[in-house]
Amino acid sequence: MTDHEETSTQKAVSLTDTNDLFQLLNELESRFLPMRSHEKKEVDIGRIQQRPHKIGEYPGSVYIEIPIEIKNKIMEETNQFSQDFKPIQSLHISLTKEFSLREHQIPLFVQEVRKKIKRFPTFTITFGQLELLLNPEQNTEFLSIQVTSPEILSLIDLLDTVMMSFNLEKYYEERKIHSSLMYRTEHLKEPYELLSFDKCLVSFKPATIKIRLGEIVYTCVLGGNSM
């Protein structure tokens, strides 16, 4: 057998191994990732990626979705700011920094997150004061509400262990847990008198957390809940 023939055979074996790998990954995905949904692509500045997108990678984030009834209560209370700020369509609480994964990493990442949080006890999310936050580029200001539940810090610590196992960045050292409600790109840093919220009126118990990777959202059930 010539050197050329040996090289061609090696390439064929390599191609077969690659096909087997993709088949195995597809089987794993169907087994471990049943709760996922395709969402309509919407222009929502609250979820715009700040990190540059690389070809072959899927931008991702892990977050808690704020229920519509809680969102409506908060937006009613902050209606006075609507003349100067534009509303953000879907309210959420970020639990990780933005990150990127390659396609073959996605099944294992989702599996690891689900494994970590399935025993995490149910807790109540409460809100505190409103605050104005600037983005890193200093060109957009967000009207945000503080999240005051101490349990959410433990949840972030737990997710940090998953992030590090995939060589991804941990959450910010200076933790300002919040949900952005509205934004503006003009008259930045203009002072406002911001109000507080009654914890009893604006609170909820999350049953799940979400993982968004590209346009697909995966649902992960928190411990003490069933779906």
Where does each model-flagged region fall?
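Histidine-dependent nucleotide/RNA phosphoesterase domain, centered on the 2H-phosphoesterase fold
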Residues: 1-227
